[in-house]
Structures are given as C-alpha cells and as structure tokens.
Amino acid sequence: MNLTTMGQAAKAAAFDLAVAPTAQKNKALAIIADELEANKDAILAANEKDIKAAVEAGISEAMQDRLLLTEERLVGIANDVRNVINLNDPVGSEIDSKVLENGMSLSRRRVPIGVIGVIYEARPNVTIDIASLCLKTGNASILRGGKETFFSNMELVKVIQVALEKAGLPAASVQYIEKPDRELVSQLLTMDDYVDMIIPRGGAGLHKMCKENSSIPVIIGGFGISHAFVDESADLERALVVVDNSKAQRPSACNALDTLLVHEAVAPQFLALLVNNMAGRVELVAEPKAYGLLKEFEGVSLREAQEGDFDTEWLSYTLGVKVVADVNEAAAHMQKHNASHSDTILTNNIESAEKFINTAGSAAVYVNASTRFTDGAQFGLGAEVAVSTQKLHARGPMGLEELTSYKWVGKADYLIRS
C-alpha cells in the first residue's frame, strides 16, 4: 500500500469536492444511505466476522458492543446520513463582512479544510459519520480504523465509494488504509504535503502518539473523564435517574459517566439510592469516605479506589465514587483528574450551578442533564467526526462548521494600495 499515492489522490479529490455544488454532495449522501440499507446483508455478515474474531481474542463485552452492528443500528446510521443532507452546507457562506474606508468590500467565507486524516478504534459507525461529514463540507478523507473492525469497514468503504462514483464524485474522496501496520500510521502523520488535519479518536495512548509524532495539526477527540456532581440542594430521586442514564445507558460510549462526586451533606441518602438502583449492574470504586458508607449495604459490587482509578475512562459498568465537601472540592477534583469531556451538576442552587459551569474545564458542561448528550446528533449538528477535548481549533462535538476554515475575500473597483 502506497500512502503517498493515496495522499496525492486525496488532494486531487479535495479540489473537486471544494467546488462541488451542494446538490451533488447531497446526492452522494442520499445514495450512501440507500446503499447501506440495500447492502445490509453483506455489511452485517462482515460485522459477524469482526465479532467472532473479537470473541476469540477475548475482547471485553463493552468493546464488543462498540464493534457490533445490528439491522437496527444500520438503519440508524443510514438515517444519520440523511440527517446530514438536511443540514445547511456551510461551504461558501459568509461569516461576516464589512466595507473598508477605501471602498473594498471585505468578507470571511467558509471553505473546506482540504484532506482530513482520521485514526480511530473499534466503532464501525465512525467510518460513515466521518465520510458523510467530510463529504458535505467538501473535504477528502483518509481513514484508518482499528483492526477489530477490518471486515466491517472494508464493506462500508466499498458502499461509500460506489455511491461517490454514482454521484459523479471521485471515489478517492474517501480512502481507507487497509493494512493494520502501525508504521503506516506513523507515515500518515508526516504526510503534511497532502493531509491538512489529523483527528485521532481513541484512547490516551493514541492521542499521545499522534501529538508527539505528527507534523500535521492534530485535533484530539474522544478521551476524557466525565463527572457528575450531586449537590446538597439536588432533588435526589431525579438526580439518580440522570446519574443512571449517564452511566448505564451505553457505558462503552466516550460520554458515559466515569466518576460520581456527592456532596457530603446528602451522601448517606444518595448513596443508598445509588446502591438500590445499581446493585448487580455496576461495580463501584470508592475513595475512603464513600467506601465507608457503601460497605454497609448488601448486594453492592464494591472495591476501594487505587491510584489511577479516578484517571480511568472506564467504558464499562464501573463507576468511581467520591464524597466531597462542596462544589469547590468537586471542581478541584475534576481539574486534577482530566475533566475535559463532559461534566454535569445536579442541583437546585443557581449559584452552585454557575460556579460549576465557570470552573469546569470540560468541552461540554451540563446543569441537571445527562453527560450522554455530548453528541453531534443530540446537539443538532448531525453526526460528528469527533468530540474535541482541546481548545483549538474546535471544541466539543465537531459538526459541519468545525470541518471548515475560512478565506478572506476582498472585492473592489480596480483598487490599489496608496
């Protein structure tokens, strides 16, 4: 596999995509959605191969859930693509404009970034999400998925490329690095002649490797510890529902709850509710104060927290629990333990809510809402290419606008500079 050739093809495709009309891009998206449903048997058969290999390799059930495609999930993915069709195309839109004193009309106009390289692990739906958003914004993409979803991704990329050709767009608009060789990833990270942005979606190790080795700007997406703080003023019964949704609705998601912080004034009552709700489903990993309260209950899966536990993105039915004195201690804990993704406070106190919002360093902060809302579709952005946990160039769910840059456009009447 020659990555230089792929890069050259992607760059050429990016020029075509940059000037493709919205109608043509939407046509390609519509065909992708239809082809996903028309080829469901082949896609699900390929996914079965990936799941079988995962079981044989002893991959955790949480990770297997990330790999799994079902007919229902496939329909959902196709509908997500159709939702992207209905979103406004940001390419060519003016961000702002003004007329200068010299008579020049000056504006900033949204343009595609160019070629985007995305390195991701496990979830096959990411392949479609990335391709559809890049296509809508006129960007070519080079994808490198995890070896765990090799067969699924190959089938999905085949569907995408067929759809592109049917719509009259270059098949090289979306390319896939088939070999799992890590050396190819290292090579991709240095292809700054062809690739304009790298987005790694995975764990801390992948992010670190990309930041240290890439000569291309990197957007860090996905990893971060998510927290919920139950304040003393919270409606405890309703707070429990939010905590349960944050943790247990889909624990393998990157926006699932990792650490629960509970105000000491309500800790005995709330932890009793928590145990009653989560016994037999969730393992609790508790610091000393919380452990002292939780060990009194029967039927709880419980262990004492060890060093590093509160820095762990669990992605499973495990939850860190800590009792804190107030919102200030909650904020201090979050700052220490990589609160960069999604955090929520459950409270009926406006001052506590505002303090939490202002001190939380995460990309998405909620008041009385589940952390599970940090998602492009939930935010009305369509699908997402990543959830950026850094502060530049984008932050939070990266939808269409976050996949564009801008150019300055000046219009005048044969104007010269004096």
UniProtKB/Swiss-Prot annotation:
This entry's Gene Ontology molecular function terms read: glutamate-5-semialdehyde dehydrogenase activity; NADP binding
As its record notes, the protein acts as a catalyst of:
L-glutamate 5-semialdehyde + phosphate + NADP(+) = L-glutamyl 5-phosphate + NADPH + H(+)
Entry's localization field: Cytoplasm
**Do you know which CDD domains this protein is assigned to?**
ALDH_F18-19_ProA-GPR
| Family under the similarity heading | Belongs to the gamma-glutamyl phosphate reductase family.
Gene of this entry: proA
Query: Signal sequence: where?
Result: none
> What is the official name of this protein in its record?
Gamma-glutamyl phosphate reductase
State what this protein does: Catalyzes the NADPH-dependent reduction of L-glutamate 5-phosphate into L-glutamate 5-semialdehyde and phosphate. The product spontaneously undergoes cyclization to form 1-pyrroline-5-carboxylate.
Record lineage: Bacteria, Pseudomonadati, Pseudomonadota, Gammaproteobacteria, Vibrionales
GO terms for cellular component? cytoplasm
Q: Kindly state a single biological-process term from the GO annotations of this entry.
A: L-proline biosynthetic process
Superkingdom assignment:
Bacteria
Keywords (A to Z) from UniProt: Amino-acid biosynthesis, Cytoplasm, NADP, Oxidoreductase, Proline biosynthesis
Task: Give the residues annotated as coiled coil.
Answer: none
EC number annotated for this UniProt entry = 1.2.1.41
Q: In which pathway does it act?
A: Amino-acid biosynthesis; L-proline biosynthesis; L-glutamate 5-semialdehyde from L-glutamate: step 2/2
